[in-house]
């Protein structure tokens, strides 16, 4: 699983208990994402823009309703994703990838993650459900 370190604003996340290192009324969120080899994030979208910068290796970003497009980013490349576009990413390296991520909007504007229907189906098959607020959680 990937680790998500919130630097400015909570931004978009499934773990409601996370607190950012820098609090305040910022119009953007900054995070560092640690992604183990072969791991990443499945197709999803946000209500605001998102920008990725892989800091220590390559990163594969895929997008489109069926993930029909993809690009391999090199270290320090930048990739900007517009509002509402289904996207995902993967670490193709043999080491942990660290990604600098910026998401537009305040915590209130960002909203929740919108998962692709296929991702929701896989999550439910693996024992996850959505709570009353729309967040994924274990059935237990």
What are these regions (language model features)?
Residues 45-75, 85:
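A short beta-strand-loop-beta hairpin characteristic of the jelly-roll/cupin
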Residues 27-29, 48, 96:
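A structure-centric signal for secondary-structure junctions around beta-strands
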Residues 88-140:
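Double-stranded beta-helix
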